[in-house]
């Protein structure tokens, strides 16, 4: 929209219908202990590019949140192991190899001990529902069509249960693939949902 593009946004249900509210959405370049393995598989240069792209995305989130009036907080991210300190040390070395300012650290506030942990400052958290609502509020209402399911794709034609949409470009922004192409990811992925309970008077973990 900022670039002046004409667009249409469709959703098979309600916008933000599956987004968790009042949660801590984590925005980080630290996606588990993956960097040592990425260097082995793809090399240092490509792994550094991956890390820098994720770091740039954090900055972009800050910029968008400022623009739409959504709160965002700086936070540190941690990767830890309860029983494999060597794995964490290798991850720490890999992060330094690609230029990340990581440090070996404990995990304060956990109700259990850890063998080792890597801490990376400059990450962020926000409320994803608040963010999505703020972004949607900047869009013209007549370009948003809820309860409109995409049933099939033919080039840049999107066939819905309410008619056909033609566009120069189509962006499929679903968490789960809706077309059976591009690597057959629908065969490799599965959906997962987790829950958290806050209990009063329960024994400590």
Language model feature labels by segment:
Residues 22-53:
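Glycine-rich active-site loop/strand segments that organize a redox cofactor
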Residues 45, 49-63, 90:
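A non-catalytic, amphipathic alpha-helix used as a structural packing/dimerization or gating element
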Residues 3, 98, 138:
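Conserved dinucleotide-binding and phosphotransfer motif residues
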Residues 2-22:
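Glycine-rich FAD pyrophosphate-binding loop
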Residues 92-95, 117-169, 173:
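Helical element adjacent to the flavin cofactor pocket in flavoenzyme catalytic cores
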Residues 163-204:
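Central helical "cap/lid" subdomain
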Residues 33-40, 62-134:
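Flavin (FAD/FMN) cofactor-binding and adjacent substrate-gating region
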Residues 5-7, 102, 170:
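Hydrophobic anchor at the start of a short beta-strand
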